[in-house]
Amino acid sequence: MNQSEMCPRFEKAVDILSKRWVALIVFQLLNGSQRFSEIEAALPNLSGRVLSERLKELELEGVVKRDVIPETPVRIEYSLTDKGKALAPILGEISKWATEWIDPSFLD
Protein backbone atom coordinates (compact mmCIF):
# COMPACT_ATOMS: atom_id res chain seq x y z
CA MET A 1 0.00 0.00 0.00
CA ASN A 2 1.48 3.35 -0.99
CA GLN A 3 1.29 6.63 0.92
CA SER A 4 -1.60 8.06 -1.14
CA GLU A 5 -3.74 4.99 -0.37
CA MET A 6 -2.92 5.03 3.34
CA CYS A 7 -3.52 8.72 4.05
CA PRO A 8 -7.35 8.67 3.76
CA ARG A 9 -7.55 5.51 5.89
CA PHE A 10 -5.18 6.93 8.51
CA GLU A 11 -7.10 10.20 8.52
CA LYS A 12 -10.40 8.34 9.02
CA ALA A 13 -8.94 6.30 11.90
CA VAL A 14 -7.64 9.43 13.62
CA ASP A 15 -10.98 11.15 12.99
CA ILE A 16 -12.84 8.32 14.75
CA LEU A 17 -10.46 8.03 17.71
CA SER A 18 -9.95 11.75 18.25
CA LYS A 19 -13.63 12.46 18.83
CA ARG A 20 -14.15 13.45 22.46
CA TRP A 21 -14.79 10.44 24.71
CA VAL A 22 -14.43 7.78 22.00
CA ALA A 23 -11.08 6.40 23.17
CA LEU A 24 -12.27 6.30 26.79
CA ILE A 25 -15.49 4.50 25.82
CA VAL A 26 -13.56 1.92 23.80
CA PHE A 27 -11.01 1.57 26.63
CA GLN A 28 -13.88 0.93 29.07
CA LEU A 29 -15.44 -1.68 26.77
CA LEU A 30 -12.14 -3.56 26.62
CA ASN A 31 -13.28 -4.90 30.03
CA GLY A 32 -16.15 -6.73 28.31
CA SER A 33 -19.84 -6.21 27.56
CA GLN A 34 -21.48 -3.47 29.59
CA ARG A 35 -24.82 -1.81 29.96
CA PHE A 36 -25.26 1.88 29.25
CA SER A 37 -25.47 2.69 32.97
CA GLU A 38 -22.20 0.84 33.67
CA ILE A 39 -20.33 2.82 31.02
CA GLU A 40 -21.93 6.04 32.27
CA ALA A 41 -20.90 5.28 35.87
CA ALA A 42 -17.31 4.51 34.81
CA LEU A 43 -17.04 7.84 32.97
CA PRO A 44 -18.78 10.28 35.35
CA ASN A 45 -17.90 13.46 33.42
CA LEU A 46 -19.56 12.11 30.28
CA SER A 47 -23.21 13.09 29.86
CA GLY A 48 -25.78 10.46 28.95
CA ARG A 49 -26.65 12.36 25.77
CA VAL A 50 -23.06 12.39 24.52
CA LEU A 51 -22.54 8.75 25.53
CA SER A 52 -25.62 7.78 23.52
CA GLU A 53 -24.35 9.74 20.48
CA ARG A 54 -20.87 8.22 20.67
CA LEU A 55 -22.19 4.66 21.06
CA LYS A 56 -24.40 5.15 17.97
CA GLU A 57 -21.45 6.54 16.00
CA LEU A 58 -19.19 3.67 17.08
CA GLU A 59 -21.91 1.19 16.15
CA LEU A 60 -22.18 2.75 12.68
CA GLU A 61 -18.40 2.52 12.30
CA GLY A 62 -18.52 -1.18 13.24
CA VAL A 63 -16.45 -0.69 16.40
CA VAL A 64 -19.23 -1.36 18.93
CA LYS A 65 -22.02 -3.91 18.87
CA ARG A 66 -25.37 -3.29 20.57
CA ASP A 67 -27.04 -6.45 21.85
CA VAL A 68 -30.69 -6.49 22.88
CA ILE A 69 -31.29 -9.26 25.41
CA PRO A 70 -34.97 -10.24 25.39
CA GLU A 71 -35.65 -10.32 29.11
CA THR A 72 -38.23 -8.50 31.13
CA PRO A 73 -37.29 -5.73 31.28
CA VAL A 74 -35.32 -5.72 28.03
CA ARG A 75 -31.59 -5.47 28.65
CA ILE A 76 -29.20 -3.76 26.24
CA GLU A 77 -25.47 -4.41 26.36
CA TYR A 78 -22.64 -2.86 24.40
CA SER A 79 -19.49 -4.71 23.43
CA LEU A 80 -16.57 -4.32 21.08
CA THR A 81 -16.56 -5.99 17.69
CA ASP A 82 -13.35 -7.55 16.38
CA LYS A 83 -12.66 -4.17 14.78
CA GLY A 84 -13.03 -2.52 18.20
CA LYS A 85 -10.94 -5.15 19.98
CA ALA A 86 -8.16 -4.50 17.46
CA LEU A 87 -7.75 -1.08 19.11
CA ALA A 88 -6.56 -2.68 22.37
CA PRO A 89 -2.82 -2.54 21.58
CA ILE A 90 -3.10 1.06 20.38
CA LEU A 91 -4.93 2.20 23.51
CA GLY A 92 -2.52 0.18 25.64
CA GLU A 93 0.42 2.04 24.11
CA ILE A 94 -1.30 5.39 24.65
CA SER A 95 -1.87 4.39 28.28
CA LYS A 96 1.82 3.51 28.71
CA TRP A 97 2.87 6.76 27.05
CA ALA A 98 0.54 8.76 29.33
CA THR A 99 1.90 7.04 32.44
CA GLU A 100 5.44 7.89 31.44
CA TRP A 101 5.02 11.36 29.99
CA ILE A 102 1.94 13.10 31.42
CA ASP A 103 2.77 15.01 34.59
CA PRO A 104 0.03 14.33 37.18
CA SER A 105 0.26 17.91 38.42
CA PHE A 106 -1.22 19.09 35.09
CA LEU A 107 -4.36 16.95 35.42
CA ASP A 108 -7.68 18.54 36.37
Curated annotation (Swiss-Prot):
TM stretches of this protein: none
GO biological process, one term: negative regulation of DNA-templated transcription
Domain (HTH hxlR-type): residue spans on this chain: 7-106
Keyword DNA-binding among record annotations: yes
Taxonomic superkingdom: Bacteria
This protein's UniProt keywords: DNA-binding, Transcription, Transcription regulation
Any one GO CC term of the record: protein-DNA complex
InterPro entries attached to this UniProt entry: HTH_HxlR, WH-like_DNA-bd_sf, WH_DNA-bd_sf
Pfam families associated with the record: HxlR
GO molecular function, a single term: transcription cis-regulatory region binding
PANTHER family: TRANSCRIPTIONAL REGULATOR, MARR FAMILY
Protein name in the entry: Uncharacterized HTH-type transcriptional regulator YvaP
The organism's taxonomic lineage, starting at the top: Bacteria, Bacillati, Bacillota, Bacilli, Bacillales
